[in-house]
Every structure is written in C-alpha cells, then in structure tokens.
Amino acid sequence: MRPTGPTSLVTRRLIGELRRAARRNSAPVWLRVAELLERPRRRRAEVNLSKINRHARDGEMVIVPGKVLGAGALEKKVTVAALSFSLQALVKIRLSGSRAITLEEAVRENPRGSRTRIII
C-alpha cells in the first residue's frame, strides 16, 4: 500500500511539531491544525481575506491550515498564521495593520492556543 499524507518534508516536520506542541501545552487547537494539514493538497484550505474579515474579531489570531488568498479586504487588526500566503494577501494584510506569520511562529507566540480561530 502506498503511503498517504503530505510528501513535503517541511510540511511533515511542521505536523510533527504541531502534534508535540498540542501534547506539551494541552492545546487541542494545534492538534486540529495538524489533522487539517494532513489532508491531501487538493483538499487543503484556501481562504480569502474577505472570509477572515467576516469571521475574525480584533486582536485574535486567525489560523489557516492552508493558503491565504488576496480577494477582499481586511479591516480588522488580527494576526494571520498560515501555511502560505499569496503575494497580494501579504500586501493587503500589512496595509491593514495586521500581521502575517507562519504556523511555526504562531506556536512559539501562543503555545496554549488561546484567542485563536481556525478558518477553513
């Protein structure tokens, strides 16, 4: 039987790190993000900024277990953590005064996973 799951070593390492952080910090949010990242690439989340703007609150950390795309506008001050960002999304996030960080940085900044919202 063929192995399933991500073939990218970077993604596999990230999934392992998220699982360890979930156990170490009793933070089920990181376990859920790891499970979502284990999906096939074609089923991975692609989230537009308009959706983040609709569902997030000011000051929250928004986690996207996939790619953030630049459609729409971001009017709230949030921290967006994702596997990857489109160039247009990065520009719009920075112009709105929000922050764009990687998932590794999100685990380091918020190991307990408090005040986070997963958007898929």
Curated annotation (Swiss-Prot):
One of its GO terms (biological process) is translation. SUPFAM superfamilies: Ribosomal proteins L15p and L18e. GO terms for molecular function: structural constituent of ribosome. It comes from the Archaea. GO terms for cellular component: ribonucleoprotein complex; ribosome. Keywords: Ribonucleoprotein, Ribosomal protein. Belongs to the eukaryotic ribosomal protein eL18 family. This is Large ribosomal subunit protein eL18. The gene is rpl18e.
